[in-house]
Amino acid sequence: MKRVFLLIATNLAILLVASIVMSILGVNTSTMGGLLVFAAIFGFGGSFISLAISKWMAKKTMGCEVIVQPRDETERWLVDTVTRQAKQAGINMPEVAIYQSPEMNAFATGPSKNNALVAVSTGLLYGMTRDEIEGVLAHEVSHVANGDMVTLTLIQGVVNTFVIFAARVVAGIIDNFVSSNDEEGQGLGMFAYMGVVFVLDMLFGILASIIVAYFSRIREFKADEGAARLAGKDKMIAALERLRAGPESGAMPAQMSAFGINGKRSMADFMMSHPPLEKRIAALKNS
């Protein structure tokens, strides 16, 4: 409920500030409410649809094979470990799956903390010790228990709304300026206006990605802390040390990558969904 109130308050604040700025700049604000509704529908619509089908998409895109009946001792241990950690975290048992990939990675997804999926790669399952795997599983279970999927969906919805809303407001200001300085008062024209909106969508979209990445990194530190409580600090540190010693993670769909144990490196830390492994290890050692 707190997230919903935060969501409403954030969008109302966006509308209020935009309306004040538009009034100062002399832009007609009579359609601001309609524009915000339009932006929110599209901004949140895509995010919530993506969240609703996240488990289905993960299974299809990653080729996840859900363990219904363990076929061997390794799968039995995997299911038992997640079962124990889920009980410790106070959530319903997530589905447990394995996907074929040589790289060591894992992810959690799902529309809610009581309707989730935890998946591990074959590279991780057979390339790590059980203590290290236990640390990884605890990290993913912590993502689920913390409600990170819903939290980041709300954040993504807010920034999507901002991008759609702000791009069209700024384009309107530009159109108004051009119109006021044009003898014919025609403004930008439809195609030029659409071009300006497109460019602004891209620019604001980059800013939005930085904001989402910032919150994602915070959630990663929180998931590491949760993993230390569920499995023990030493196991979580050992898992991160093993990941640091291994090759960089390859491509993974963005929604799964955001909740993976290990993210891809970027040209700049502020664009990364995951903090550098060195910082995560240091944070655990100093906690």
From Swiss-Prot:
It is a multi-pass membrane protein. Binds 1 zinc ion per subunit. Zn(2+) binds at H139, H143, E220. The active site is at E140. The chain crosses the membrane at residues 4-24, 33-53, 154-174, 195-215. Belongs to the peptidase M48B family. This is Protease HtpX. It comes from Shewanella denitrificans (strain OS217 / ATCC BAA-1090 / DSM 15013). One of its GO terms (biological process) is proteolysis. GO terms for cellular component: plasma membrane. Keywords: Cell inner membrane, Cell membrane, Hydrolase, Membrane, Metal-binding, Metalloprotease, Protease, Transmembrane, Transmembrane helix, Zinc. Its EC number is 3.4.24.-. It is found in: Cell inner membrane. Disulfide bonds: none annotated. Pfam families: Peptidase_M48. Its main location: membrane. InterPro entries: HtpX_protease, Pept_M48_protease_HtpX, Peptidase_M48. Its cofactor is Zn(2+). One of its GO terms (molecular function) is metalloendopeptidase activity. NCBIfam families: PRK05457.1.
